[in-house]
């Protein structure tokens, strides 16, 4: 995985506009709804890029809370916070991770999430090319693949929303009964 992260560190360093954090905005309404529905107070943006979605564009104001930030290719966010977090979201990240590293990534995410996980995943090749010449989207798969990965590798069951876009536009909710149990316990 270190080779892959090094590729992204080089890519980030090439231009200040590479992965600034602009993949959050198209998904923000889904995440805001999840934060409100689950009354989440602690969040983690897993794969935040350079973080401009918070420092410049102030998207956290819509969330009602400033999330913790993690991106292994950005020096100021390279330390994975231990959590736990009420909610964890990742937008335009999973498709950048080599298939053989997905079990580790799902463990990192799902072991830290208490109320929800939201994954927005692109299902077509990227415009971006890494310094090695490889396409930045190395795991381009349908929503069924991603659902199977969550079911197989998440160390615990968490209320999960998966949105895919690109060549496979879909939305799926996993473990909805966990949310319903929690919701009903609020009364």
What residue ranges belong to the model's regions?
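Conserved N-terminal segment of class I S-adenosyl-L-methionine
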Residues: 1-87, 103-106, 112, 123, ...
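A short SAM/SAH-binding and catalytic strip from SAM-dependent methyltransferases
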Residues: 89-100
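Short glycine-centered segments of the SAM/dcSAM-binding site in methyltransferase folds
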Residues: 115-118
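Short "lid" loop at the C-terminus of a central beta-strand within the Rossmann-like core
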Residues: 122-128
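Substrate-binding/catalytic groove segments of enzymes
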Residues: 156-157
